[in-house]
């Protein structure tokens, strides 16, 4: 019998690869996306359009507004840094975001009778977010099995899958291409233009472009003028 899995799916490069991996491993993917007041909502629109073509049997979009909390360049009137990937936790970190996302995924998984949750976090080519580290994922998995009926009654055990955790961005892209992922249908930019074109300069764009450059293929999504500085991509006037 095919096992069900909840896949956190933003419409970005990592989560789209994660969805493809879940399918390849024989799971029936139920994709979950979030509209939380993020400034890069073009990513969510792509998720809505592409979840089922990407292999999800069901796609749920959960809506809430983290702009009421603020504290991040993605949800408040704070400039998105464009100087490069730094060593400190950047202002694009959204407080407790992955904890919120995984909690919703856990609730849905329990209702679906699914014991597997996939999340596309990465601890190598990443911006330094604390909720993308392996120790965080391990801790959440422990909590999931302490805080649910399934876990307490012992009728099953939840597992949080983070298959991209120890891969470079280039390795993620290679894996996705091997699985047939169309990266032209993904979006990663934190600060896209009003037309939804990626800036090419934020942390997320830089890491993405670096990955494609290391793979030796062009990033199929367009970038605004000057957004090609790390290789790959196609500029638009």
From Swiss-Prot:
Keywords: ATP-binding, Ligase, Metal-binding, Nucleotide-binding, Queuosine biosynthesis, Zinc. Binds 1 zinc ion per subunit. CDD domains: QueC-like. Its EC number is 6.3.4.20. It catalyses: 7-carboxy-7-deazaguanine + NH4(+) + ATP = 7-cyano-7-deazaguanine + ADP + phosphate + H2O + H(+). It is an enzyme of class 6 (ligase). GO terms for molecular function: ATP binding; ligase activity, forming carbon-nitrogen bonds; zinc ion binding. One of its GO terms (biological process) is queuosine biosynthetic process. Zn(2+) binds at residues 189, 199, 202, 205. ATP binds at residues 9-19. Transmembrane segments: none annotated. It comes from the Bacteria. Its cofactor is Zn(2+). Belongs to the QueC family. Catalyzes the ATP-dependent conversion of 7-carboxy-7-deazaguanine (CDG) to 7-cyano-7-deazaguanine (preQ(0)). This is 7-cyano-7-deazaguanine synthase. It comes from Geobacter sulfurreducens (strain ATCC 51573 / DSM 12127 / PCA).
